[in-house]
């Protein structure tokens, strides 16, 4: 599902619309443009191990905008503050706990204020304390950005605390 929404896989049947665009009719350039309007929080964060937390969050801004360094600095610190980690900007991924790494990855995912956020198992591998520490920022950031979020997870209990709607998918079909 997430691969189709992200444009990595074409729909085999029917029509899939993402941020108002019919995915099956888009060329590669249009798919890349559509992807700039969305972001993804990967299951285990996927932070660049040789970059600090600050540099991980700044990466997209440097790659996809022409913002000045001073503006990037302010925005990165704002994104880290939004996930409760402004003071961790200098830390390397190896110095972060699992919950902290997931929150840095969340700050990186929201760096460009996406319209659509996708989360791949955001609660996987987290201890009970870290579960709530990642769940609440997901909900707050979704509301603040006015974004649509899609959370793929097996952790129904945690999901119910932060979602507006829940769909159950089995064997490629929505069952509830």
Residue ranges and their predicted role:
Residues 6:
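Helix-to-loop junction immediately C-terminal to a conserved catalytic motif
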Residues 92-96, 100:
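Conserved ABC ATPase signature
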Residues 113:
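Conserved catalytic motifs of ABC-family nucleotide-binding domains
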Residues 117-120:
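Catalytic Walker B motif of ABC-type/P-loop ATPase nucleotide-binding domains
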Residues 21-22, 69-88:
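Conserved ABC ATPase "signature" region
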Residues 14-22:
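Conserved ABC transporter NBD signature motif
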């Amino acid at each position: 599902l997430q691969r189709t929404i992200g444009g990595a896989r074409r729909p085999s049947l029917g029509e899939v619309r993402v941020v108002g665009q019919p995915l099956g009719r888009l060329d590669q350039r249009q798919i890349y443009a559509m992807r700039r309007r969305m972001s993804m929080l990967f299951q285990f964060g996927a932070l660049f191990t040789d970059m600090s937390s600050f540099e991980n969050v700044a990466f997209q801004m440097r790659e996809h905008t022409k913002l000045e360094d001073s503006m990037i600095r302010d925005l990165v610190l704002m994104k880290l503050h939004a996930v409760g980690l402004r003071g961790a900007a200098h830390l390397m991924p190896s110095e972060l706990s699992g919950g902290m790494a997931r929150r840095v990855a969340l700050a990186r995912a929201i760096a460009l204020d996406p319209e659509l956020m996708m989360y791949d198992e955001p609660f996987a591998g987290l201890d009970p304390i870290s579960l709530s520490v990642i769940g609440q920022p997901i909900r707050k950031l979704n509301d603040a950005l006015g974004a649509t979020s899609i959370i793929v997870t097996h952790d129904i209990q945690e999901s119910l605390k932060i979602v507006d709607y829940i769909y159950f998918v089995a064997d490629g079909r929505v069952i509830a």
